[in-house]
Amino acid sequence: MHCLPVPVILLLLIASTPSVDARPKTKDDVPPASFHGADNANRILRTLWNLRGCCEDKTCCFIG
């Protein structure tokens, strides 16, 4: 057996590579997108609700 099969070589290479996440996660690690996600969603919903409510009597409608 002069040469190892290709799958065995690939498995050895994959096993020897470092992990993508080399630093352990802590409780303070929060992705930037989810940090302000709830605030942005609430602000958008509040704006849409206000537009819907005030457009009925046309006193403060910004659309059309």
UniProtKB/Swiss-Prot annotation:
MF (Gene Ontology): toxin activity
Intracellular or extracellular location(s): Secreted
Record PTM text: Contains 2 disulfide bonds that can be either 'C1-C3, C2-C4' or 'C1-C4, C2-C3', since these disulfide connectivities have been observed for conotoxins with cysteine framework V (for examples, see AC P0DQQ7 and AC P81755).
Pfam families xrefs: Chi-conotoxin (PF16981)
Positions of post-translational Isoleucine amide modification: I63
Keyword Lipoprotein: no
Cited InterPro entries: T-conotoxin
Maturation propeptide residues: 23-51
Keywords: Amidation, Disulfide bond, Neurotoxin, Secreted, Signal, Toxin
Main location: secreted
GO cellular component, one term: extracellular region
Tissue specificity comment: Expressed by the venom duct.
Signal sequence coordinates: 1-22
Description of its domains: The cysteine framework is V (CC-CC).
Family: Belongs to the conotoxin T superfamily.
The protein's name: Conotoxin Ts-011
Organism name: Conus tessulatus (Tessellate cone)
